[in-house]
């Protein structure tokens, strides 16, 4: 059995999830990397090893409960325990007004952004109870906003926040929370800037493009450091909360534990 904390991170092949895995590796944690692209996961696994952590690569689609259960079972078999989950996998599509949205696309968004977290938690709940585990569900400011042409994304994230409140009420031995990672320089932002011309209002697209041009997008490493800290150290009083990544109660101790840079 691993003597280090074992954390499952979904959406770990790029962007925020990959950065979370790297920070966890710097602390020496064992990380199960979950995403749909095995090739990209293997690249992140190499980074994890260089930074002092150990990893397990599991190719899986979080919208499939059986795939999530396999990820949990494989982690348990490999490391002997599961201490934390970081449910980061998410998609911003479909981007269209409600009247024009394909029902199958809308359903798929909810399956990834909401059901994916439920599936992994459901599969891992016994292991997490055993180790008084932590669950960090990555949400969004969109959970509290009405963004035109992003109804599925907004709905999924809002539901994720309330699901996490219920989870925290039911599982008093666990620490379960949602976190807003801010506006991060990831592939999701690239989609909003470059692939939404016929979907989003023009002023909304202009706003996203200005964020990039002005250098106002947060590097993934900054919110990822906060999320990694929460996965390892989130106190019980955070359970059920929707927290900002730059909340001083998180960002300050995260900086103290991990330092300013990954290397």
Predicted regions: what is each one?
Residues 121, 156:
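Active-site helix of classical SDR
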């Amino acid at each position: 059995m691993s003597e280090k904390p074992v954390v499952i991170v979904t959406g770990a092949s790029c962007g925020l999830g990959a950065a979370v895995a790297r920070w966890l590796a710097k602390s020496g944690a064992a990380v199960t990397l979950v995403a749909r692209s095995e090739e990209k996961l293997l690249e992140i696994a190499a980074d994890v090893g260089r930074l002092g952590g150990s990893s397990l690569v599991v190719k899986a689609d979080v919208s499939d409960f059986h795939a999530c259960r396999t990820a949990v079972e494989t982690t348990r078999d490999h490391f002997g325990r599961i201490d934390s989950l970081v449910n980061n996998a998410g998609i911003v599509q479909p981007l269209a007004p409600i009247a024009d949205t394909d029902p199958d696309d809308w359903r798929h968004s909810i399956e990834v952004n909401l059901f994916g977290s439920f599936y992994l938690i459901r599969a891992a709940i016994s292991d997490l109870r055993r180790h008084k585990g932590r669950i960090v569900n990555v949400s969004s400011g969109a959970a509290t906003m009405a963004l035109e042409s992003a109804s599925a994304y907004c709905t999924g994230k809002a539901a994720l926040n309330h699901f996490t409140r219920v989870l925290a009420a039911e599982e008093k031995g666990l620490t379960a929370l949602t976190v807003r990672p801010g506006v991060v320089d990831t592939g999701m932002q690239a989609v909003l800037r470059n692939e939404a011309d016929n979907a989003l209002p023009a002023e909304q697209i202009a706003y996203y493009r200005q964020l990039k041009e002005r250098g106002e997008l947060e590097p993934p490493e900054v919110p990822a450091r906060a999320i990694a800290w929460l996965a390892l150290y989130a106190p019980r009083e955070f359970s059920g909360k929707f927290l900002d990544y730059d909340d001083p109660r998180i960002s300050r101790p995260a900086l103290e534990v991990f330092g300013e840079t990954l290397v």
